[in-house]
């Protein structure tokens, strides 16, 4: 990735206009141009885009990088994700119920499963390469931080692909830089601020009203009859023995997984779907991501608050490193779902969108492949002139790009650390107060 530094005016109104221009039509065009984007959070963040950095005000230099990222591309976690559609098609074939295209699709599914069956949940080779490239980009972009004597601390949740992603990144950094203090840890002791589950919020995630809204949206966007007619010779057999909604979705999910495997240039399933069908499938998955990790009005708008502990950690560590006399890098590798919630909680680029209308998501530019694809990250870069400089500035990068925060700044995309910290602390304390009040009311009943 080539990084250029340039001088430009960055204002809140301009950024808001850019954000609001992300209409449903532009998202649809993006997906039609690159169908792999329909994979949503399984789309791989490109590593060949040219990024730009606005010059830092007042000659300040980066001294601390606080990073929360997801793993790079990996195979599906569950063998049944591969065997489900395969068994449905194989059974139909044994009864002579497949069209020639259906038989060809069965053969493709067999090839895909053969490649994946012993690698379920593992990092793909392309994923490993992606993580090395992203690490190198960070080094190239902030050379002042990766110097002799710097501390680079890598932490991962206890998942195979997260551990390997962290490992690939740290190996690349060690190769590219002068001797540094490199530390790696993967432990459940990190779960309190890296793999956070809030059972109370999860219990409300798909309440009755939310489930009804999602199912209505899902049915409005489903159109599986054409595909079933292409694959099967007997409509009556399909009606009695095939769940067309499930099979269509299974084929779509598998289609999206191929892009990061050795079969990417050999096999596709996208040809089974029209551009409109691909877009509709993506809308359904995007809506589910939003309901689960965003700020959907019908389940209370608070699902993103499940990741308040990581935000507390970002704020705490930002103050803790100020008195350290050498650069520090904290790299944390968690899930894309949890990263999505953190991004929504921080309201980066307006992704803290609150709506009860799932049709509004793409119209408002809320697209999961833009938010937390494979290799996604939130990087908070801290800047100062020297250790006596109390006016620390931060810049937040979302997936490598300069990002708008929900606060005013006289030097955006840079923000005064004290302003950002104050805003987020108030937000977190307000939620804790609301939670306490609700618990008190329950106890009085």
Q: At which residue positions do the language-model features occur?
A:
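Bacterial Sec-dependent N-terminal signal peptides
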Residues: 1-27
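Signature for phosphate-centric chemistry
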Residues: 25-153, 157-330, 334-445
């Amino acid at each position: 990735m080539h990084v250029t530094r340039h001088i430009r005016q960055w204002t809140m109104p301009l950024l808001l206009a850019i954000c609001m221009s992300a209409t449903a039509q532009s998202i649809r065009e993006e997906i039609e141009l690159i169908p792999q984007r329909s994979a949503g959070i399984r789309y791989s963040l490109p590593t060949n885009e040219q990024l730009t950095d606005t010059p830092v005000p007042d000659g300040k230099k980066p001294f601390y990088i606080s990073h929360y990222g997801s793993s790079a591309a990996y195979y599906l976690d569950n063998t049944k994700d591969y065997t489900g559609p395969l068994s449905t098609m194989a059974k139909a074939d044994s009864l002579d119920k497949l069209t020639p295209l259906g038989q060809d699709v069965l053969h493709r599914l067999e090839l895909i499963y053969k490649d994946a069956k012993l690698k379920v949940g593992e990092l793909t080779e392309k994923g490993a390469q992606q993580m090395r490239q992203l690490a190198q980009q960070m080094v190239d972009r902030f050379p002042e931080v990766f110097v002799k004597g710097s501390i680079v601390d890598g932490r991962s949740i206890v998942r195979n692909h997260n551990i390997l992603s962290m490992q690939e990144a740290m190996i690349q950094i060690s190769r590219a830089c002068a001797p540094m203090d490199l530390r790696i840890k993967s432990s459940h002791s990190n779960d309190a601020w890296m793999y956070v589950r809030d059972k109370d919020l999860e219990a409300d995630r798909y309440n009755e009203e939310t489930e009804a809204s999602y199912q209505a949206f899902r049915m409005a966007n489903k159109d599986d009859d054409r595909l079933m007619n292409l694959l099967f010779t007997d409509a009556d057999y399909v009606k009695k023995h095939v769940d067309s909604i499930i099979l269509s979705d299974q084929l779509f999910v598998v289609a999206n997984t191929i892009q990061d495997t050795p079969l990417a240039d050999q096999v596709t399933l996208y040809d089974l779907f029209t551009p409109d069908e691909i877009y509709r499938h993506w809308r359904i998955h995007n809506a589910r991501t939003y309901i689960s990790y965003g700020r959907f009005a019908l389940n209370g708008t608070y699902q993103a608050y499940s990741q308040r502990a990581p935000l507390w950690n970002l704020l705490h560590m930002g103050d803790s490193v100020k008195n350290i006399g050498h650069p520090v890098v904290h790299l944390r590798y968690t899930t894309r779902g949890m990263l999505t919630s953190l991004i929504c909680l921080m309201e980066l680029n307006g992704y803290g969108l609150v709506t009860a209308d799932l049709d509004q998501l793409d119209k408002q530019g809320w697209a999961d492949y833009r938010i937390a694809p494979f290799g996604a990250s939130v990087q908070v870069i801290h800047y100062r002139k020297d250790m006596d400089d109390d006016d620390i500035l931060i810049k937040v990068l979302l997936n490598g790009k300069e990002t708008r925060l929900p606060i005013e700044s006289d030097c955006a995309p840079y923000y005064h650390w004290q302003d950002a910290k104050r805003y987020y602390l108030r937000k977190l304390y307000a939620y804790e107060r609301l939670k306490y009040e609700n618990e008190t009311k329950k106890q009085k009943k």
